[in-house]
């Protein structure tokens, strides 16, 4: 057995591969971006072959930088963008359509029809989710209805459905493994999180044939072995989790009441609720945090669709910055007397508002508003939305401790200005870990602990290390005024008024 573990982190805009050694140190990385496809307003797609090519390229780069070969790997862990739908031919492996991405809103009208028919309560009771285009089920139904012959082929067992993890495992194993894990399954809108299986009633509701669904496993399990012809060596795939659940694991949020927030393209906060499957009264999601040895740990999740993507918009859309790294410096230079609010509802608003038809808006603009004020507004929007999520979580689940500490990760967590403003607006400490690649770390832990290369959960939690703690310094009056302005801006953006 080799002494290294490979984490594949397949994201929304790029794929990453990270090699860890037996001491949990990063020894090699690779990253490859791939194109985003926008066929219509509100539609977002990926070419599955482009996803695959980016994964292969990043793996080759990571192994080369680690100065090892595939044969030196003890195991592979996979983490991935969730909810994104891929459908492919079981015999040829060829996708029948581009992947429909989690950000895609094309099924908004279908979701509204189902809501009007009074079906959301049934969906939420079974899945912990809401009837929103965000999740996989309505996307899959759309594909079956709009790709010629797809439904008949699916009913005959000729098509495979998967989230991105399933598609990658299929290709890595040369088509031998058709599997997913409980966390990815829990995001599909057709998986019953209480009974731990695909739900016949929901499949009938969305007219999805059960024959096209993968087997669901624990997060740490035997997912298959890579095909030597594809990968260069036969390496076991032993860990899989959706990206936000993998980050929860990588942050060692194993105790009920612990909460983490990941800042990438979107922002996602998860609160560990242990064995307690909390029914949210604040339109948060009840989801599976992880499933180990057949035991399910649940979480409350709040999903923000636009976080780092707002900074990309400043760079690529408005062209007011040249590089994302400039944003924090610019924000620090903003005029404190000019309160500008950005509500980044570019693809609707997520939790706790769930308004798919809301669109982005800027408030408070004057003739003196410039790039600095826009940069501050973009970064503060992420902080305000996080505050909304955590307020809703604590309203739903009273078992958490009053002295909450938020563990953060993702690209935006590297910004000292943003993390300080986050602590200020939360009125709570924010901890940034020493290993910022927590999503990949979580996937690596699942695989490495199963193969015996790394320790178990207790020892892993003790090894978690903090890089920096940001303590709140903003006075209560300023914080209250800023939050009031934000909530007024959101209210004016919502389509319901």
Swiss-Prot record:
EC number: 2.7.1.30
Positions contributing to ADP binding: 12, 16, 265, 308, 411
Catalytic activity: glycerol + ATP = sn-glycerol 3-phosphate + ADP + H(+)
Biological process annotations from GO: glycerol catabolic process; glycerol metabolic process; glycerol-3-phosphate metabolic process
Main EC class the enzyme belongs to: transferase
Notes on activation and inhibition: Inhibited by fructose 1,6-bisphosphate (FBP).
Binding site for sn-glycerol 3-phosphate: 12, 82-83, 134, 243
Disulfide partners: none
SUPFAM superfamilies in alphabetical order: Actin-like ATPase domain
Single GO cellular component term: cytosol
Record family assignment: Belongs to the FGGY kinase family.
Function, in words: Key enzyme in the regulation of glycerol uptake and metabolism. Catalyzes the phosphorylation of glycerol to yield sn-glycerol 3-phosphate.
Protein name: Glycerol kinase
Organism of provenance: Allorhizobium ampelinum (strain ATCC BAA-846 / DSM 112012 / S4)
């Amino acid at each position: 057995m080799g002494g290294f573990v490979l984490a594949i982190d397949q994201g929304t805009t790029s794929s990453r591969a990270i090699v860890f050694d037996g001491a949990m140190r990063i020894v090699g990385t690779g990253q490859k971006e791939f194109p985003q496809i926008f066929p219509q307003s509100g539609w977002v797609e990926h070419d599955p072959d482009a996803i695959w090519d980016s994964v292969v390229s990043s793996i080759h780069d990571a192994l080369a930088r680690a100065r090892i070969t595939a044969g030196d790997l003890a195991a592979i862990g996979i983490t991935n963008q969730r909810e994104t739908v891929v459908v492919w031919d079981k015999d040829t492996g060829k996708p029948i359509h581009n992947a429909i991405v989690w950000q895609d809103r094309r099924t908004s009208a279908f979701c509204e029809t189902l809501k009007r028919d009074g079906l959301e309560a049934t969906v939420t009771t079974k899945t912990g989710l809401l009837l929103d285009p965000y999740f996989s089920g309505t996307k899959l139904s759309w594909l079956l209805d709009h790709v010629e012959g797809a439904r008949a082929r699916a009913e005959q067992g000729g098509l495979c459905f998967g989230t991105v993890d399933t598609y990658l495992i299929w290709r890595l194993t040369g088509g031998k493994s058709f599997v997913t894990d409980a966390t990815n399954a829990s995001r599909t809108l057709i998986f019953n999180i209480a009974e731990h299986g695909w739900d016949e009633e929901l499949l009938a509701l969305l007219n999805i044939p059960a024959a096209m669904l993968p087997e669901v496993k624990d997060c740490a399990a035997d997912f298959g072995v890579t095909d030597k012809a594809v990968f260069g060596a036969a390496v076991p795939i032993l860990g899989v989790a959706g990206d936000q659940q993998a980050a929860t694991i990588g942050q060692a949020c194993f105790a009920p009441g612990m909460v983490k927030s990941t800042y990438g393209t979107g922002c996602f906060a998860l609160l560990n609720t242990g064995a307690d499957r909390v029914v949210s009264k604040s339109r948060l999601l009840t989801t599976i945090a992880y499933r180990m040895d057949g035991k399910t740990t649940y979480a409350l999740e709040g999903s923000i669709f636009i976080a780092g993507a707002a900074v990309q918009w400043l760079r690529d859309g408005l062209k007011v910055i040249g590089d994302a790294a400039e944003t924090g410096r610019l924000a620090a230079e903003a005029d404190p007397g000019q309160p500008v609010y950005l509500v980044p509802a570019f693809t609707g608003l997520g939790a706790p508002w769930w308004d798919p038809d809301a669109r982005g808006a800027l408030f408070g603009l004057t003739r003196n508003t410039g790039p600095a004020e826009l940069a501050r507004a973009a970064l503060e929007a992420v902080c305000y939305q996080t505050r909304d999520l955590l307020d809703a979580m604590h309203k739903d689940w009273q078992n958490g401790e009053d002295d909450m500490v938020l563990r953060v990760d993702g690209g935006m967590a590297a910004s000292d200005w943003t993390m300080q403003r986050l602590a200020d607006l939360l009125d709570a400490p924010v901890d940034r870990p020493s290993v910022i690649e927590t999503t990949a770390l979580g996937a690596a832990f699942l695989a490495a602990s199963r193969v015996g290369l790394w320790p178990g959960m207790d020892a892993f939690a003790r090894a978690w290390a903090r890089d920096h703690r940001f303590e709140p310094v903003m006075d209560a009056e300023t914080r209250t005024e800023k939050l009031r302005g934000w909530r007024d801006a959101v209210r004016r953006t919502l389509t319901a008024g």
